[in-house]
């Protein structure tokens, strides 16, 4: 009988987390989780984070930095824990700040995100964009001379509908 109670309590905890977001948001978080779960074992671990950073062009991430990220979780990071962590961070958050923080996870030093990687991700992940949609976005937000996307301006336009002055 004890296992049934434990199972119900766990299911209840999960449903609270899932009720914090709309279905479309949950799907977007699932896609982000899948991208980060590089070894496809259902958990995000140190190796997954290191591989994700490498895919974004950050090859020299310190072990301490990755350890700090992992320590934010109460245990192994499965999708429910991942969603809970984002839910806690997003409570009462400003939409512009929230989106910027999502980009900053992959650009903590503020050096920029390579537009080639962004293009690839937008075209290959679930809910993918067409080549025409990608071309339109990069026509409006061309990469800088280093090939980086000005995501701060992009986020401002997404949340405010106009470019920063």
Swiss-Prot record:
CC per GO annotation: cytoplasm; myofibril; myosin complex
Designated name of the protein: Myosin regulatory light chain 2A, cardiac muscle isoform
Sequence ranges assigned to domain EF-hand in this UniProt record: 24-59, 94-128, 129-164
UniProt modified residues of type N,N,N-trimethylalanine: 2
Keyword Repeat among record annotations: yes
Sorted UniProt keywords: Calcium, Metal-binding, Methylation, Motor protein, Muscle protein, Myosin, Repeat
PTM comment text: The N-terminus is blocked. N,N,N-trimethylalanine, found in other myosin light chains would not have been detected in the N-terminal tryptic peptide in PubMed:7319048 because it would remain trimethylated and ninhydrin negative after hydrolysis.
Organism for this UniProt entry: Gallus gallus
């Amino acid at each position: 009988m004890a296992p049934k109670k434990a199972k119900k309590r766990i299911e209840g905890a999960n449903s609270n987390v899932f009720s914090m977001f709309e279905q479309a948001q949950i799907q977007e978080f699932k896609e982000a989780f899948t991208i980060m779960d590089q070894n496809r074992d259902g958990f995000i671990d140190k190796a997954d984070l290191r591989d994700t950073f490498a895919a974004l062009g950050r090859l020299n991430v310190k072990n301490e930095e990755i350890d700090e990220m992992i320590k934010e979780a109460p245990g192994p990071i499965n999708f429910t824990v991942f969603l809970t962590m984002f839910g806690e961070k997003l409570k009462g958050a400003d939409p512009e700040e929230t989106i910027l923080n999502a980009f900053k996870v992959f650009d903590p030093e503020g050096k920029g995100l390579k537009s080639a990687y962004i293009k690839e991700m937008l075209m290959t992940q679930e809910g993918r964009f067409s080549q025409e949609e990608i071309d339109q976005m990069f026509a409006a937000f061309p990469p800088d001379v280093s090939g980086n996307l000005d995501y701060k301006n992009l986020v401002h336009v997404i949340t405010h509908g106009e470019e920063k002055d």
